[in-house]
């Protein structure tokens, strides 16, 4: 992998959120109660960490997530959720794949986890970007029967692009493999692949097991015991992140829904700062003028919060706001701290063909999609005025500075990173260096 890419893609604050176990339905049921006293207070006695399962379709990500909840449920650290409870959408069950990201809550002896189960199907890879963008670390699942596959590589690339630095490997379906040399080959390939994408492949924990055996209570050495080894590795290898608590509150909007008689709830992952009930907020993005509102309730995993803080996946009940006034990609922010913009100067790295990017160059007026926080917006790219030759081509593997015009106002800040996608694949990544308008 180009040495330039890791330099451009250093660790940043994680910038997006997903649904908490189809978050809208969970918080909807909670907020629809006549009073919020229904919800227990959220326990903050353990460090809170956001992790997730990534990897190729059908390699067992959702089965592993279910196996983790079953194993920890026996120890009082989770509520058991089977495969169907995690893949709740009818289309997901019918096709046997995860389409949107779903969140599960559990605890080990050391930590409280919010676990996002990311889709592996190529048609829904952009939803995986949202899931990956909120992880403090990740478990990449690879089937022993297949080894690394195309989405194994793409998920590692996406995880690297959004700032995930620590990866634990779970080699799944080992109950179907009789040849130990095949398992050794899969481990060797995964270590090489991690190194190729800028991770520490030499030292990353690799756990061999079978999520299905853990679910069905068979072969405990590769079932339940392997799941506990995996969780121990996650506890030890993925560091507890330092949260950005001292800056003004900001939470990107992931999902929106209405609660009859209560108001509108926005769900998302708090990017920075703190929020308390009764505080005033601005909703920024899409509109030229921010919307003003007041927070009337905060909950996480069906538990009431007095306040939300950076790293929390929360539902926020807003006063006087209709659902049709809000869109995914907006942000909730402390009044006066964030503005929406339509033109920026950005430093871009265009992925090479070998990195899964474009096979050919592009010129001025290129129109890809920009993924930034939870926003997905079309941009028109042009060379800065200082560039003499506006007819030149930007080639795969290039670093280049471009002016980007966004088709609608989007909350942006200098220093933010974003992904560029076109035709169902990631083609580049960028860093905002200047706000123009």
Swiss-Prot record:
Stretches for region G5: 210-212
* Compartments, record wording: Mitochondrion
Biological processes per GO annotation: mitochondrial translation; mitochondrial translational elongation; regulation of translation
List every stretch annotated G3.
117-120
Residues binding GTP are 55-62, 117-121, 172-175
PTM annotation, UniProt:
The precursor is processed in two steps involving mitochondrial intermediate peptidase (MIP) and mitochondrial processing peptidase (MPP).
Q: Where is the transit peptide?
A: 1-38
Question: Which residue intervals make up region (G1)?
Answer: 55-62
- Do the record's keywords include Metal-binding? no
Which domain of life does this protein belong to? Eukaryota
Pathway(s): Protein biosynthesis; polypeptide chain elongation
Q: Could you give a GO molecular-function term held by this entry? A: GTP binding
CDD domains, per the entry: EF_Tu, EFTU_II, EFTU_III
Which parts of this chain are annotated as the region G4? 172-175
Record key words, sorted = Elongation factor, GTP-binding, Mitochondrion, Nucleotide-binding, Protein biosynthesis, Transit peptide
Renumbered to this chain, region (G2) spans: 96-100
Specify the tr-type G domain's residue ranges: 46-242
Can you quote a single GO CC term? mitochondrion
Keyword set includes Methyltransferase: no
Its family remark reads: Belongs to the TRAFAC class translation factor GTPase superfamily. Classic translation factor GTPase family. EF-Tu/EF-1A subfamily.
Miscellaneous note, as given in the UniProt record, is: Present with 58527 molecules/cell in log phase SD medium.
Q: What does this protein do?
A: G-protein that, in its active GTP-bound form, binds to and delivers aminoacyl-tRNA to the A-site of ribosomes during protein biosynthesis. In the presence of a correct codon-anticodon match between the aminoacyl-tRNA and the A-site codon of the ribosome-bound mRNA, the ribosome acts as a GTPase activator and the GTP is hydrolyzed. The inactive GDP-bound form leaves the ribosome and must be recycled before binding another molecule of aminoacyl-tRNA. Required for mitochondrial protein biosynthesis and maintenance of mitochondrial DNA.
Q: HAMAP family recorded for this chain? A: EF_Tu_B
Q: What is this protein called?
A: Elongation factor Tu, mitochondrial
